Amino acid sequence: INSIGATIVPVLVGYLIGTISSETSIANANPALFLAMGIFALAFIVLFSMNIPEPHAAAAVANGVKNSHSPLSFRHFVLGAIAIFLYVGIEVGIPNIANLFMTGSTEANGLGIDTTTAGSVVGTYWFLMFIGRLTGGSLGAKFSSKGMLSFVSLLGLVFVLLAIFIPETQMVNMPVFKADISFGLAQVPMSIMFLILCGLCTSVMWGGIFNLATEGLGKYTAATSGQSRLPSQ
């Protein structure tokens, strides 16, 4: 659901905002902001009305035994928390920077692409993450977390290097939704395409890092599961 929503929202927001120009103001984003407020309100109502039991937390309170060690005493857990912090910056940074570059005016060294098309390109990144998670889930039993994480990290590095060194004049056609919500092909720099392909790589990184960071922690697993999420917030 998360990946599907992330695929659709950039296209929808791009359509609601319209073409960015010198006259564009924050008021153009009001429809998208009102939509976000409605989603947050709905999520609050659903969570407030549901009773979600937490048996592990209740058992820990009932036990009342203070652990002599902290989860931070495990070196691989600390490294995993740092890795998740860096990963989240990369995961959200790639589509955000790509979107700013595509929608920026040509006077500001941007591409001047309309927001709907740019949002569709960015949505492809999140859609590839969805595909990657499905693929990673089916292959998870056949390959170790370390092996899978090493492979996608190397592949992502190759994609980023290609995006850096390929000239912006090298163009490629990508399937997108356009400003009139018609579906077709749009020319974007090949470097943008390689950044979008990084979605396949980032799709399984969080799970791989989490598995390696919490491996062999025994009774500390529950505590570290929550703490390892803090860098991603």
Predicted features and spans:
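C-terminal membrane-cytosol helix-exit motif in multi-pass small-molecule transporters
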Residues: 9, 13-19, 34-60
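Glycine-rich segments within core transmembrane alpha-helices of 12-TM secondary carriers
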Residues: 1-17, 229-233
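Helix-to-loop junctions at the C-terminal end of transmembrane segments
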Residues: 17, 132-145, 170
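Juxtamembrane intracellular "pre-TM" segments in multi-pass secondary transporters
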Residues: 54-80, 182
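Extracytoplasmic gate region of multi-pass secondary transporters
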Residues: 9-14, 70-126
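Intracellular juxtamembrane helix-capping segments at the cytosolic ends
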Residues: 1, 203-221, 225-226
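Residue-level signature of mid-helix packing/kink "hotspots" within the transmembrane helices
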Residues: 7, 126-134
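C-terminal transmembrane helical hairpin of 12-TM major facilitator-type secondary transporters
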Residues: 143-209
